[in-house]
């Protein structure tokens, strides 16, 4: 009798079934991981801008959106980042703060994100009354970056 060489059809079918089960579990988990990292990237794009706003307010200056140089005659500091600096979305500043009497909002709208975050917004708001920053997001609860709330 000849010795068997290779795999039988049933063995190959079992391997294919195992790979299918692993893929069914791994792909959704990877998509969730990508969605969480998009939120973290958006927050990381906006968070450092708080320093620019605080510095301008401490000097009694205003902050304008976009890039450029300080204008001492207008007492104006650029935000220091282009609106489209992150490929995941856009950054906006409202209102342009001058004397700290109005609440300041930095928003990141995720226009270039994946399907789970498309159009979602991360907002950093500085209240004029106490000068504290608060991060909120309209993302699904599981994708909101640490330090933000719904």
UniProtKB/Swiss-Prot annotation:
Its main location: other. It is a single-pass membrane protein. This is Fimbrial protein. The pili are polar flexible filaments of about 5.4 nanometers diameter and 2.5 micrometers average length; they consist of only a single polypeptide chain arranged in a helical configuration of five subunits per turn in the assembled pilus. The keyword Transmembrane helix applies. The chain crosses the membrane at residues 7-27. The modification N-methylphenylalanine is found at residue 7.
